Amino acid sequence: MQAQYLEAILSSNPTERAAIYATLSSEERSYIVRLLDSYINNPYLIYEDDPVGFIEKGIGESLWTKQKEIVNSVRDNKRTAVPACHAPGKSHIAARIIAWWIAVHPIGTAQVVTTATTFRQVKNILWPHIRKLVKKTNLGGEVSQVEWKIDGELVAFGFSPADTDETAVQGIHAPHLLVVVDEAGGLSQTLGVALESLMTGGHTRLLLLGNPPTDNEDSWFERACNSDLYNVIPIGAYDTPNFTGESAGICRTCPASVAEHSVGTHLVDETWVR
């Protein structure tokens, strides 16, 4: 709702803006003033309900169809599962979703928790994407190996508890809570159920990313992908731009010293599926 108010005012000309103000009560005008003050401090507020806009307009990157499905699903659904092939950019898009979640909520009200099968995966797969994204944008704060802090506030962190340590997730809560499970195929049933218990109240979201099971059948991730509780978005190699012919846009994440190239360079291609 805040985003809609802001967008209507910011996109209007002075005459239209005056007409809008004329229809408002003094209390509503005060509310608009507070929103505009907030916008000055955080221009990303207009993307509260528009994660695609945040990524494409706010930070200037391209998205292809399946990526848009994922980010909109996190906006609209409490639980999203993405069983995907190798190298479709799962961790890349997860980092953008995390950035959107933190950027559009007031500091201190939102938190992101990430986990994976091992701490090595937490540290080396998803968090480098988060670190690079924060560094190249004006999202603010400092990102260490597995923590993102803004003005001293811990807004996101990664961890990997023991398979049977369901108590490790106790006490995790925030008005706006996003939990991201990378390499979800290896997560234990005990931890999976514990993470799902965090979805019981408030504005909470759970995003699972992983490869379809091969030798680890009947895993918690596989059950989630077969559950009506989840919005499931499968991504096969032939769903990605190098096979569909869809434009993936120009890569904006590599250093400026790297020659301009398509995002498709980083995605699964024919050499992977031969």
Which residue stretches match the model-derived regions?
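Phosphate/NTP-binding elements of NTP-utilizing enzymes
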Residues: M1-R274
